[in-house]
Amino acid sequence: MKILVLNAGSSTQKSCLYEIADEAFSTQASQPLWEGKINWTQDRGVAEIEVKTATGATLQESISDDSPQAHLAYMLNTLSDGDTKVIDRLSEIDVVGHRIVHGGEDYRDSVVITEDVKKAIASLSNLAPAHNPVALSGIEAIEKILKDVTQIAVFDTGFHATIPDAAAIYPGPYQWVEQGIRRYGFHGISHQYCSQRAAQILGQDVASGRLITCHLGNGCSLAAIKNGRSIDTTMGFTPLEGLMMGSRSGSVDPGILIYLLRYCDYSVEKLDEILNKASGLKGISGVSSDMREVRKAIAQGNSRAQLAWDIYVHRLRSGIGAMVTSLGGLDALVFTAGVGEHSAEIRQAACEAFGFLGLKLDLQKNQQKPVDEDIATNDSAVRVLVIHTQEDWAIAQHCWQILKN
């Protein structure tokens, strides 16, 4: 079975093609036959396209004066044409899976995409404006390029559907609940994959134990996972709540927003722009939303960069502590995504706060660029794992299961 995965971001479109045996889905992530990525400039008029294959073939091109859907079509044509060809015809693709950031209350399990599903994705775009519209654009592009191929929506909110009401419902008027305003949580595909991979690494049943998964990228969230089910998470009604992030503020006192609107002549649009794109590491440091650049600035004596680091670490530790109380203890702490996987300093800073739980980090292992490894000492009461998140593989798994069922 050939499965194409589309993972749409606010300024990127990542794609992978997997070939998976029809009779059984491997528990180990396999290397895709083909990987493609589109990076758009701010005006989306220029696309930087990168393609690579499992055999080592590569392609890099810049395309301008065309639509994003045309850019996607161009990239997908490299599947069956040129040096990066891995299939004879695009019609060989059996199914296309899409990461959909927000599924709302109605869509929690992965589903075959219909007109009703497309309408729901569109209606939820105001809750995930950077992601749902571009995902919908990708769905519509596939309809034109691959015609009647089955398309499947895999929702980032789905894994968190098991969060109990006490953790999911905000303490506002009950009318909010009736309007669907509640904690949905995000990065669910990543959190679920990492919980399953952690069980494999530790040799345990996925439906046992107490895990906290730390998805730390440009967007950041934590999930408390008990016996394989999400019971709490830091992101909420939108991906803006929770930890300090690259350019997003995370949680702030709502009174600040009222103050800015009432007394500082802020519009809703300006507030939205600031909270999502000019806050977090970028807003505090004045340097970058990229943790690597912030670290470089700290080394050069930049006090604002140091403050950004200190706030980031404080909020990460506080968030982990809150998840520990939801779980009633902790068996394993998992780090994943760009910062979580690659910043030994962040992992060490986070773990230092939890020595009282018996957590002991092996400092040497932590520095050795671990991938899918346990980096706690042998006598640590809490295991500490670094896991390379494989969202695309997880989406392919959902697609395979739906077609088989």
UniProtKB/Swiss-Prot annotation:
Pfam families: Acetate_kinase. The record marks H187, R248 as: Transition state stabilizer. PROSITE patterns: ACETATE_KINASE_1, ACETATE_KINASE_2. HAMAP family: Acetate_kinase. It catalyses: acetate + ATP = acetyl phosphate + ADP. Mg(2+). Can also accept Mn(2+). Mg(2+) binds at N7, E391. CDD domains: ASKHA_NBD_AcK_PK. GO terms for cellular component: cytoplasm. It comes from Nostoc punctiforme (strain ATCC 29133 / PCC 73102). Substrate binds at R99. Its EC number is 2.7.2.1. Catalyzes the formation of acetyl phosphate from acetate and ATP. Can also catalyze the reverse reaction. This is Acetate kinase. It comes from the Bacteria.
